[in-house]
Amino acid sequence: RAAWKEGEKPGSPLSVRAKILTHDSRRYADELYWWEARPEVRLGPPSWHWVERAIESTRQLNAPGILEKITTPILLMATTADRLVDTQRIVRDSKRLPNSELLLFGNEAAHELLREADPVRDMCLDRISRFFEERAPKQ
């Protein structure tokens, strides 16, 4: 299997990368603006150390009883159309978190939910606001 999925490989055409991240070309253009204005914010591919640490942390989270012990309220947001992460895994793990809620989108959303077209982005922002109001009301 290839080490990179289409659009993840460093140097992939920006049009491919854009489609994987968002349906909103203006919000993707914002990323390109910042890459040009502040080149130091542009990230390259992960280091081997990062990959090793990610694998180890995933291994630890997979252990029985670990996610089940987390009692902090957690709002997860994902899309079944995500081409970068395993949405089935997010759904499965959300069921292991005793105090979590999952907002799941379909083909209307790509990976970057808060950089999506307004209907999706607005739903996310609204749900985040309501989540805080419900779970951490102002005193």
Identify the function of each model-found stretch:
Residues 46-66:
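Active-site nucleophile elbow and catalytic-triad environment of alpha/beta-hydrolase enzymes
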Residues 100-139:
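Catalytic active-site module of serine/aspartate enzymes centered on a nucleophile-bearing elbow/loop
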Residues 1-45:
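Alpha/beta-hydrolase-fold enzymes
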Residues 26, 45, 49, 88, ...:
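Conserved active-site and cofactor/substrate-binding residues in soluble primary-metabolism enzymes
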Residues 83-86, 114:
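Nucleotide-sugar-dependent glycosyltransferase donor-binding/catalytic pocket residues
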Residues 71-73, 99-100:
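A generic structural signal for alpha->beta connector loops
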Residues 63, 72, 85-95:
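Short alpha-helix in the alpha/beta-hydrolase fold that links the catalytic acid
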Residues 70, 76-78, 82:
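Short beta-strand/loop motif that positions the catalytic acidic residue
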